[in-house]
UniProtKB/Swiss-Prot annotation:
The chain crosses the membrane at residues 37-57, 68-88, 102-122. It is found in: Cell inner membrane. This is Fluoride-specific ion channel FluC. Na(+) binds at residues 76, 79. Belongs to the fluoride channel Fluc/FEX (TC 1.A.43) family. Keywords: Cell inner membrane, Cell membrane, Ion channel, Ion transport, Membrane, Metal-binding, Sodium, Transmembrane, Transmembrane helix, Transport. Fluoride-specific ion channel. Important for reducing fluoride concentration in the cell, thus reducing its toxicity. It catalyses: fluoride(in) = fluoride(out).
Length: 127
């Protein structure tokens, strides 16, 4: 199957999931913090760690198509670092410097930590 089509199909799934998370966050969590974006960035990092670990440990022969669909498509559509950047910039432009710094720092720290936890989990599950 064409790589662009696989990425597009996966991206549609990931973006739809991201939209759903955003709707749930807006309806059920306190306003004033980008909960949906925070969640998808951290969960997406965890999922990428698990996927990378699985591909390295158990799916050496995984097709390029599977990698394109899952990593570039689904997870690329799900995670939202471009939205994250916009939200940080918006906070900074609004004079919310402390909030922007806290949001950026916590998101990056937890995202990278979640990726390492995902890799660790993959070694425990798939090795």
């Amino acid at each position: 199957m064409n790589g662009f089509l696989l990425v597009a199909l996966g991206g549609a799934i990931g973006a739809s999931l991201r939209h759903g998370v955003g709707l749930v966050a807006v309806r059920h969590l306190p306003l004033g913090w980008p909960w949906g974006t925070s969640f998808v960035n951290i969960a997406g990092s965890l999922a990428m760690g698990l996927l990378a670990g699985w591909l390295a440990l158990k799916a050496e022969g995984a097709s390029q198509e599977a990698r394109l669909f899952l990593a570039t498509g689904v997870l690329g559509g799900f995670t939202t670092f471009s939205a994250f950047s916009l939200e940080v910039a918006t906070m900074l432009r609004s004079g919310e410097t402390l909030k922007a710094g806290l949001y950026a720092g916590v998101s990056v720290l937890l995202g990278v930590s979640a990726l390492f936890i995902g890799l660790w989990m993959a070694r425990r599950i798939f090795a």
